Amino acid sequence: MTTITDPGTEMTQPVRRVRVGLVFAVGLAAVTAIAAIHLTQGSSDVGLSDLLALLTGGGADETAAVLVASRLPRLVAGVLVGVALGFAGTILQSVARNPLAAPDTLGVDAGAYFAVVATTSLGISLPVIPSGAVAFVGGLVAAGIVLGLSSAGATGPTRLVLAGSALGMALFSASTFLLILDPEGTVGLYAWRAGNIAQTGFAGVARMAPLLVVALAACLFAGRRLDLLALGDDTATVLGLRVGRARASLIVLAVFLTACSVAIAGPLGFVGLAAPALVRLAVAHIPELNRHRMLLPLGALAGVLVVLAADVLLRAFLGGKYGVEVPTGVVTSIFGAAVLVWIASRHRDSGRTPPSPGAGAGVRSRRRFILVTTAAVGITVAAALVGMMGGDTWVLMGDLANWIEESASAGLMFVLDARLPRVLSALLAGAALAVAGTVVQGVTRNPLAEPGLLGISGGAGLGAVAVIIYLPGAGLWTVTVAAAIGALVAFAAVYALSARGGLGTDRLVLVGMGVWFGSMALITVILVMTDPWNLALALTWLSGSTYGRTLPQIVPILVALVTIFPLTIAGHRQLDIMALDEDTPRLLGEPLGRDRLLALVGAALLTAAAVSAIGVLGFVGLVAPHAARALVGGHHRRVLPVAALIGASLVSVADTVGRSVIAPGQIPAGLVTALIGAPYFLWLLWKTRAPDPG
């Protein structure tokens, strides 16, 4: 029997091979070109002509020494880290079926970093391979927690990113706490946190390379399992795949690759997110690349390209000196944040309307509201009194009374005069962030949202830090205005990008988180370039601190609260309506777009004022509104004042704890609020972890 074959079909296979080969050829050519440029850069005077002379046999010994001791190890480290994170990101996105899954968004980097810091703080000094094992355990535990809270990504990208970011913030805060407790024993780990491929010799990369090769081979061998998982759990099961076991083993492989990269260069931000995103651009035009035995090597090429290009751009723009001081991970984080914003801006919300933040809170009686408010006022007053009494030197109530009457000793007057601005700034900042968080949650209809997750806190911090660093003589109001401008610019960018194709609440949160990550990376660049690795300066603004505050410095936040809070209370009905769904405000004739914009602008201004007073604080705008709704119900007329009191108490207590635990040393209030708020946030995710229907 003769089989007639369509000539077009005969030509299809060679054409496909040519297209696939062309993609890999272009990728290899790009990596080769970037690597060649990379070798010509450095802090020494060795340039392209010296390297060419060395290749032709006429180079100097100094050139060879620089190449072998510094530049080649840095290049090899960049290649290994790029390959590892490219593979890891591709695997995690395929397993979770989520384009935003990556070592960063799953908390793997943060878990690995915390494990290494915790081990070092115990006085245990580990070489490269054991430190990689410690990082692997920490990263694996973090990934397991995030995937469990987000139902393995089945509930969509928003929950996955929220869970990973919350856990990451908590672990980084805990790591910073350990750094403060043992600054001498953990020296260098703060800088290592940002990720840097600089190496002194081949020792580190030589030890990790064999482990990476074995893990990469295992990933390629598992390519068919990844292809089957992409078909869906039911289809994969029918075809004989044990889905649970396959998914678990692949996650372990991805975490192992990430741990290896962390052991070599520290947590290099967002390479595992950006590399697969670049690959998907090629896959969209060349479907033949969709098989994982093609996707994985292509993801590795993209990862190497991202890492080396970031390092080349860093040293090209900043020169040899700052190219050494500013870590490569800062540039990859900025690029990765842009990729996150790009992906999020194209994200479509699920058809199901998110529940109102007040859903399930029930209706509370007026009597209960009065009792709760009275109790909250009492707790806030008590927190303020304890804040005045506590610190490196504890005083008694009688001493406090004497200070009020101005009859205390000179030493006591000095201590309490210095504490008053700190206590007031903590109270006011906590209240402002709580009100802002209540507004943000109502507008986005997301009980897990807060000002930081919309990029507002990051923008405000960036504006304030830029003025403080570059205009050291600037006055208080200049810093406040800069923080307000930064917050409004960040908010405007988030709002504009999220509004394309309809303002979806999921999209708003995802874009906001991208802006947050980008702004924090830019803050790191400013701090490093100005005063490299000044830990106190970095922690003051990145962790939130009341240290050194004076009474005039609380005036801006007081003005913001006195102005905006009554307006927010007056608009409680609009907030209640916006918190329901997209359609109800329109049916009632409410201008939804205008109301939403005004509410978020108010939240941005309150956040900016809080940042100018105390620095960047996280989770206050999440915990306080949620606790208030649980106590007094979902109506904003009641939620707003109670949330403000809870937020004020929370930050005041956090500040007092930070001033007392390791006195005379101090822990920034932001670290304490993160250590309190992050577990609460994760508990909320656990409560609502069930997958969306359909």
Regions found by a protein language model. Give the residues of each.
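Alpha-helical transmembrane segments in inner-membrane proteins
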Residues: T2-G694
